Amino acid sequence: MSTLRAAMTQTANAYEAMPARIEDLHTLSEQLDDIRAANLDHHAQLIIHAANAGARIIGLGELFPAPYFALGRDAMWHALAEDACTGPSTTQMCALAARHRVVIVAPIYERCGRTNGRLNTAVVIDADGSVLGKFRKAHIPRGTNEQGSFDESFYYGPANESYNAPSDKVLGLNPLLPVFQTSVGRIGVSICYDRHFPHVAEGLAHAGAQLILSPAVTFGAKSQRMWEIEFECDAARHNVFIGGSNRMGVESPWNQPYFGASHFVGPNGRCTNLSDHPNLVMADLDLGSLGAPDPSGWNLQRDRNPGIDR
């Protein structure tokens, strides 16, 4: 498949009965399954819309089954973590992938069955509904900007050991930066904060990625200023397509605005958004063009000087 129609979601928490005050979040402790179900149903409709529009791969947003809860510390949200292979989110996404013959990259809140640890994880599901593997967020942020604070380290830790079973569908020598041989191409994933670390895109490209999906929940002036620049630079340097998906709008009760601006970019610039839906972006990616000579005359892999690498 040379030209791949790809889509990503750009949305926010779909559960309508959120409290108006942060102090009242505790009232949701018995509604966590309802929150997940509302977001699964919302994203199912977006997946169906994208598939009907011809998308063959659909990337969902970071922690898509829930509001972005890491704006504060509240252990209540720990109960949303689920098994990456058998939990309700992956189960429903696998069924949708098989039914609509699409690849789905589904970022969830994972509880590891082996270690009982919690992680921020993207599950990669092929178009037959099978789970090819997962990517676990490698870099976990905490900090404050001019708009608010975030502390993801309270909710999950970084990937720090091999976690995919050996498979000819999982490519690359670095087990923390897997690339997946899907039915539509070689797909890599980086999650939000990972995009700021140069070795992530480089490692995924070196492992053969043709498309890197980068789901995020991001806000703040610097993040917004760098959002497009980082992806454009990485796509040009590493000769890959990149899809950056951000939340859009606000989520009660935190009311932190997310700037959206989700888009696809390739080695030669931004890709046209073909979507007619405000919560989706979609583009046709010419994967075959990645093997053609760069029109700029660049050949960074050939001309790299290994003598100055650390």
PLM features per residue range, with description:
Residues 12, 138, 276-278:
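A generic structural motif
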Residues 17-35:
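A solvent-exposed, charged loop/short amphipathic helix patch at secondary-structure junctions
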Residues 33-137, 142-143, 218-233, 237-240:
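Cys-nucleophile CN-hydrolase/nitrilase-fold catalytic domain and related Cys-dependent amidase chemistry
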Residues 106-108, 121-124, 178-180, 262-264, ...:
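Short beta-strand scaffold segments in enzyme catalytic cores
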